[in-house]
Amino acid sequence: MPKETGRKLIAQNKRARHDYDILDTYEAGLVLMGTEVKALRAGRASLVDGFAQIADGEIWLHNVHIPEYTEGTWTNHAPRRRRKLLLHRAEIEKLIGKTREGGLTVVPLSLYFKDGRAKVEIALARGRKNYDKRHALAERDAAREMSRIMGRQAKGRV
């Protein structure tokens, strides 16, 4: 079987970019069981309620749903079990320091295969208030409208 190259997206957490201000992103490996890898290769996963927690100098991913592999038997995994993230020690120490400051959390943004290995993109994030979310939406709509008008002017269809 030929070796995989490139990046194949499995799941994205679109809600995270809406609910949080993303301050910094990291790429982490995942410790998975065999049936989890097969379920991911089938393109089935959900990051919606996921978050990362630091315990004993290790980072664990919680509430990420990887459904049971349909062809699996008694070796199947628990769909919402916690999974260990693989990061460099310096990155873990940096995340520990930042999350202890308060108001910051670690959330998963996307889950993908990179060169045949399962990876998760995690972000150091600060939660947004409802008025911040509305303000960001209004800014995005205004920018979209402005680019639409500028495009029309460039084409001479004012």
UniProtKB/Swiss-Prot annotation:
Keywords from the UniProt entry: Cytoplasm, RNA-binding
PROSITE patterns associated with the record: SSRP (PS01317)
Function of the protein: Required for rescue of stalled ribosomes mediated by trans-translation. Binds to transfer-messenger RNA (tmRNA), required for stable association of tmRNA with ribosomes. tmRNA and SmpB together mimic tRNA shape, replacing the anticodon stem-loop with SmpB. tmRNA is encoded by the ssrA gene; the 2 termini fold to resemble tRNA(Ala) and it encodes a 'tag peptide', a short internal open reading frame. During trans-translation Ala-aminoacylated tmRNA acts like a tRNA, entering the A-site of stalled ribosomes, displacing the stalled mRNA.
Protein's gene: smpB
Localization terms from the record: Cytoplasm
GO biological process, any: trans-translation
Descriptive protein name: SsrA-binding protein
CDD domains, per database record: SmpB
InterPro entries (UniProt xref): SmpB, SsrA-bd_prot, SsrA-bd_prot_CS
Record keyword Cytoplasm present: yes
Family recorded in the similarity comment: Belongs to the SmpB family.
GO molecular function: RNA binding
Matches recorded under SUPFAM superfamilies: Small protein B (SmpB) (SSF74982)
One Pfam family recorded for the sequence: SmpB
Cellular-component GO terms for this entry: cytosol
Naturally occurring in which organism (per UniProt): Parafrankia sp. (strain EAN1pec)
